[in-house]
Amino acid sequence: MLDKLTTELRNEKTMNLDEMNTIEILTAMNEEDHRVPQQIAQALPAIAPLVEETIKAMKQGGRLIYVGAGTSGRLGVLDAAECPPTFGVAPDRVIGLIAGGEKAFIEAKEGAEDDEGLGEADLKKIQLTVRDVVVGIAASGRTPYVIGALKYANQVGAVTGSLACNRGAAISRIATYPIEVETGSEVLTGSTRLKAGTAQKLVLNMISTTVMIGLGKAYKNLMVDLKPTNEKLRERSKRIIMEATDVEAAVAEKHLREAGGVVKVAIITILTGCSVDQAQMTLDRNGGFIRKAVHELN
């Protein structure tokens, strides 16, 4: 089976990898990495409908759930973990499941990915519903853990998407919204943490970021729903308010403090002159979109 996967083929350009010097190895890797964005560009028409369905689902209270094993699982967990601080969503709105559980994130758990039943069981643990979106991630496109999860998600009636790095992947036949980014042979044969992993990371960035923009988490190109939980983020929050409203630092800081640290509310109060309570109510009424709230108040 593996010999039919392009991700497992030997790369003809690196047959003498062990004889290359440092700069030659780095050059070979860099040249191969350049192929990844080109392949993703071809997959954009497949990525878009999954994003749009995810926006619809999350507006109705659904969750985005990534499922994967090994590198694929770790990338899903990583993308999910970045959403709360970046976009201000609750940790249970974007979830990453990895075969073998949390410990498998830092230490490989042998055999976990080979059990379809574990994929189903992990989704049952988080009480998957018809409102959710499940995205199965597998470079090979044939990981049993992911297949089991997608099959169960289909049974429940959840939206299903998949991300594979081989054409004609098994998970593509199961998911309603399949994405295939054919990254080809790796510099180091079969090491899919390289180009395949890079492609997966870029696509997951696209999915989560575009979904969050569709949920009102951006104003212009500013990250307005971040949570200022440390000094760096507090400074970033202040700078975002300054950029959005063209005010001085002291004014931004004052409005941020009065808004209880809620960047969106601070921006609306500055742009419209309304009270904090009025800004929050109008923002809520407009689904969290600053632009719509400001338009209503003005």
Swiss-Prot record:
GO terms for biological process: amino sugar catabolic process; N-acetylmuramic acid catabolic process; peptidoglycan turnover. Residues 54-217 form the SIS domain. Pfam families: GKRP_SIS_N (PF22645). Its EC number is 4.2.1.126. The gene is murQ. It catalyses: N-acetyl-D-muramate 6-phosphate + H2O = N-acetyl-D-glucosamine 6-phosphate + (R)-lactate. HAMAP family: MurQ (MF_00068). PANTHER family: GLUCOKINASE REGULATORY PROTEIN (PTHR10088:SF4). Homodimer. The lineage of its organism: Bacteria, Bacillati, Bacillota, Bacilli, Bacillales. GO terms for molecular function: carbohydrate derivative binding; carbon-oxygen lyase activity; ether hydrolase activity. The active site is at residues 82, 113. This is N-acetylmuramic acid 6-phosphate etherase. Keywords: Carbohydrate metabolism, Lyase. A lyase-type mechanism (elimination/hydration) is suggested for the cleavage of the lactyl ether bond of MurNAc 6-phosphate, with the formation of an alpha,beta-unsaturated aldehyde intermediate with (E)-stereochemistry, followed by the syn addition of water to give product. Pathway: Amino-sugar metabolism; N-acetylmuramate degradation. Specifically catalyzes the cleavage of the D-lactyl ether substituent of MurNAc 6-phosphate, producing GlcNAc 6-phosphate and D-lactate. Belongs to the GCKR-like family. MurNAc-6-P etherase subfamily.
